Amino acid sequence: MSGGSTGERPFSDIITSIRYWIIHSITIPSLFVAGFLFVSTGLAYDAFGTPRPNEYFTQDRQQIPLVNDRFSAKQELEDLTKGL
């Protein structure tokens, strides 16, 4: 005797039902639209605290903020972030 039944509907029955496709034909495109709006409006930058592409380099600081000496890293970071 093979394994017992859990009483759940078989997956093949679910994906071939009209009800499944009516529900998912609305929800799946809605998720893509919501994601597009989340990114295109800039809300993603605000929500996650990442700088926008035009905010990586200021007019005063055009070089890459690179730490060169690991023993004086704290002082270098303070110098790099001064004026932010």
From Swiss-Prot:
Listed GO CC annotations: chloroplast thylakoid membrane; photosystem II reaction center
Protein's UniProt name: Cytochrome b559 subunit alpha
Membrane topology: Single-pass membrane protein
InterPro entries according to UniProt: PSII_cyt_b559_asu (IPR006217), PSII_cyt_b559_asu_sf (IPR037025), PSII_cyt_b559_CS (IPR006216), PSII_cyt_b559_N (IPR013081), PSII_cytb559_asu_lum (IPR013082)
Cofactors: heme b
Quaternary state and interactors: Heterodimer of an alpha subunit and a beta subunit. PSII is composed of 1 copy each of membrane proteins PsbA, PsbB, PsbC, PsbD, PsbE, PsbF, PsbH, PsbI, PsbJ, PsbK, PsbL, PsbM, PsbT, PsbX, PsbY, PsbZ, Psb30/Ycf12, at least 3 peripheral proteins of the oxygen-evolving complex and a large number of cofactors. It forms dimeric complexes.
Entry's localization field: Plastid, Chloroplast thylakoid membrane
Entry GO MF terms: electron transfer activity; heme binding; iron ion binding
Principal subcellular localization: plastid
Cofactor note as given: With its partner (PsbF) binds heme. PSII binds additional chlorophylls, carotenoids and specific lipids.
Function of the molecule: This b-type cytochrome is tightly associated with the reaction center of photosystem II (PSII). PSII is a light-driven water:plastoquinone oxidoreductase that uses light energy to abstract electrons from H(2)O, generating O(2) and a proton gradient subsequently used for ATP formation. It consists of a core antenna complex that captures photons, and an electron transfer chain that converts photonic excitation into a charge separation.
Chain segments annotated as transmembrane: 22-36
GO biological process: photosynthetic electron transport chain
KW Heme (keyword) present: yes
Alphabetical keyword list: Chloroplast, Electron transport, Heme, Iron, Membrane, Metal-binding, Photosynthesis, Photosystem II, Plastid, Thylakoid, Transmembrane, Transmembrane helix, Transport
Protein family: Belongs to the PsbE/PsbF family.
Residues reported to bind heme: 24
Stored SUPFAM superfamilies: Cytochrome b559 subunits
Biological source species: Emiliania huxleyi (Coccolithophore)
Top-level taxon in the UniProt lineage: Eukaryota
